Amino acid sequence: MRQPAALALTLSLAIPGLGAASGVSGTTPPRQQMPTASPEQEAVEYYNDGISYRDKADKYEAEAGAENDAAKKAKLLEKSKSQHESSIKKFLKAVAKNPQMVPAWGSLGYAYRKTGNYPVALEAYDKALALEKTYTPAIEYRAEAYLGLNRLDDVKSAYMTLFNTDRKRADELTRAIDRWLEKKKADPAGIDPVKLEEFDKWASERKQLAAQTSSLTSGQELRW
């Protein structure tokens, strides 16, 4: 006569060895635990996620620059800003996990600058440079934030530092200065016209000098 399933289970628990013989186990095997990532590893993951958002933001911005339709341009710029805002969340998590991660601080400043938050951008750049004073990406990014705040003497100082240490970044700042000058010549609001003219002359002289000299160094942005 076939035993009911419940009775068979009861017997297997009551009689040693019966459970194993019948294929019924009275114990649950321990779960295998996955290794826990270190804070530094988690920071790298957040940083890479942020870079992914940043790359998309830069792509939308480039497309906007080539777009002639005003409505389409505005839409692309809004998409770019949204991606930068997403990158900020990731970079904040990265520096929370690893406050010593210089590239994350620099990229955080970049994202804040691109969304128009210059004061907070400067704080992030200052943090990066406090950790590594020769980190040229942050020097260049911070100089562009200075442009947004019309801090022209600080821009000049940053340019000279880059010119002597990282010519590639100096050239990048030169292009940013050219864009800034173009906008300010069309609308000089917030800046003394005399100072604008002096800065324009200085920038022109620096470009001529740079064209006459060979590249000294070539800085590379860190990727994690």
PLM region descriptions:
Residues 55-56, 114, 148-149, 183:
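Register position in tetratricopeptide repeats
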Residues 61, 76-93, 114-127, 149-158:
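Structural signature of tandem alpha-helical TPR/SEL1-like repeats
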Residues 28-34, 164-224:
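Terminal, low-structured helical/coil segments at or just beyond the last alpha-helical repeat
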Residues 107, 141, 175-176:
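Canonical tetratricopeptide repeat
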